[in-house]
């Protein structure tokens, strides 16, 4: 099922910065928020408890990649935090992903990173020594993720349709790198607008700087949300 709220990437360096940002929104508004490495390492698990206590949904974006037993144990801890979604690197392999699923349980969604949206095909071929196309690599990882019993993948919107064809229509495609028209793309190599992401079949979208660095973050959020959901029935 598609998520109507764009996920806001809380790419802030401190707990206080998050509090200041969220204070801009009405207290009764439930948001879907992404906590990444920078914020999690700065603020610790308490940031998740704080956000959940405010009634928000949390995507904990730590991209775990380690031996299966270590990942399983880490996921058990994350499940106790009450996260709504978290992720691993598909490159860790099927056994690692299965261990992650077992550790996390079924209450939260578990997705895998295929190729980062900052990765170009040339970079992948040179530094990862993967001598296929970028799309072929993404499809391969998506199939292995489905085989491991995970809920979906993080992927570029350009890859959504081929991933759903290679797996199944209900396989979640979470798309970062979303930028409204006219907004700088930053360090993302593969980007798309919210409306385009909807049309192509993305289930979740993640938006960071176009909201967090906007002159009016609340207005920017609602404009992106409106664009994302404008064609929903």
Curated annotation (Swiss-Prot):
It comes from the Bacteria. Pfam families: OMPdecase. PROSITE patterns: OMPDECASE. Substrate binds at residues 11, 34, 61-70, 117, 179, 188, 208-209. Pathway: Pyrimidine metabolism; UMP biosynthesis via de novo pathway; UMP from orotate: step 2/2. The keyword Lyase applies. InterPro entries: Aldolase_TIM (IPR013785), OMPdecase (IPR014732), OMPdecase_AS (IPR018089), OMPdecase_bac (IPR047596), OMPdeCOase_dom (IPR001754), RibuloseP-bd_barrel (IPR011060). The active site is at residue 63. It catalyses: orotidine 5'-phosphate + H(+) = UMP + CO2. One of its GO terms (cellular component) is cytosol. One of its GO terms (molecular function) is identical protein binding. Belongs to the OMP decarboxylase family. Type 1 subfamily. NCBIfam families: PRK00230.1 (NF001273), pyrF (TIGR01740). Homodimer. Catalyzes the decarboxylation of orotidine 5'-monophosphate (OMP) to uridine 5'-monophosphate (UMP). This is Orotidine 5'-phosphate decarboxylase. It comes from Streptococcus pneumoniae serotype 4 (strain ATCC BAA-334 / TIGR4).
């Amino acid at each position: 099922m598609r998520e109507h709220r764009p996920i806001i990437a809380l790419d802030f360096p401190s707990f206080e910065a998050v509090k200041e940002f969220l204070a801009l929104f009405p207290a009764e508004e439930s948001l879907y928020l992404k906590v990444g490495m920078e914020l999690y390492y700065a603020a610790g698990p308490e940031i998740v408890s704080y956000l959940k206590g405010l009634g928000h949904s949390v995507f904990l974006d730590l991209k775990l990649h380690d031996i299966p037993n270590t990942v399983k144990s880490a996921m058990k801890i994350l499940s106790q935090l009450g996260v709504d979604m978290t992720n691993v690197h598909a490159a860790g392999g099927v056994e690692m992903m299965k261990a992650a699923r077992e550790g996390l349980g079924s209450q939260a969604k578990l997705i895998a990173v295929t190729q980062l949206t900052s990765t170009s095909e040339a970079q992948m071929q040179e530094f990862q020594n993967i001598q296929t196309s970028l799309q072929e690599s993404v499809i391969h990882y998506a199939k292995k993720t489905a085989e491991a019993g995970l809920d979906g993948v993080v992927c570029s919107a350009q890859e959504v349709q081929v991933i759903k064809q290679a797996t199944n229509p209900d396989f979640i495609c979470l798309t970062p790198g979303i930028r409204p028209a006219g907004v700088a793309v930053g360090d993302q190599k593969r980007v798309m607008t919210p409306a385009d992401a909807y049309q192509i079949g993305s289930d979740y979208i993640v938006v960071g700087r176009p909201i967090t660095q906007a002159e009016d973050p609340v207005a920017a959020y609602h404009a992106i949300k409106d664009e994302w959901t404008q064609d929903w029935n």
